[in-house]
Amino acid sequence: MLSFPKFGHGAVAWVALVPLLSALRALPVLPALLAGLLAGFVQHVGLLYWVTHVVVHYGRLPLALGIPVMMLLALYLSLYTGLFAAGAAFFRNRGIPVVAAAPLLWTVLEYAKSTLLTGFPWENLGHSQYLNLPLIQIADVAGSYGVSFLVVLVNAALAAFVGAGRDGRRRAFVGLAAAGLLLALAGGYGTWRLADVAARFDPVPEQTVALIQGNIDQSIKWDPS
């Protein structure tokens, strides 16, 4: 929540899933599902507060219905977080490391959330990095889902390293190093891409362009009369 507008602290996203992933180490599948539902519900209520204003102001719903509508939407979206947590616990119980399972699970579920039932492609985890221009350049290759994959990979590697015992610390460090390497490669690609685009436009003469945004109230804009 803190990584998105209006807060815009994108760095928080890189550790936001560590508490949930750490808690899953001791949970069977069903309790993990419930933990994911709770975490997702809290997250989406904080992100979707504006839906209440939209359905009340433009949909003409009373506030007593506007708030439950927003909470129902948050509950639906939290199902994907719950499935993520349950899936991570399921694969962990079968010996598949969270560093391998979590990024793939999150990316697949995020794609499903963005496409099923007309889709809800807003507030995806990759969008939290909108201020990190070098990093998000990988979106021209992997889309915003690639950014989400990388964010979850780092979270999973951190959670595995923090929760590893003395015997597993070396393997967890390998996962953390691999995540750091991919992050560095993504940042390096983005830095090169930005420089390449700037070089392409450097010989082009500058031109001044004015753009005026309309300021029409939405309730008037869509009024058929």
Question: Each predicted region: which residue ranges?
Answer:
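Membrane-embedded alpha-helical bundles of multi-pass enzymes
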Residues: 1-197
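Soluble catalytic regions of membrane-associated enzymes that act on cell-envelope
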Residues: 190-225
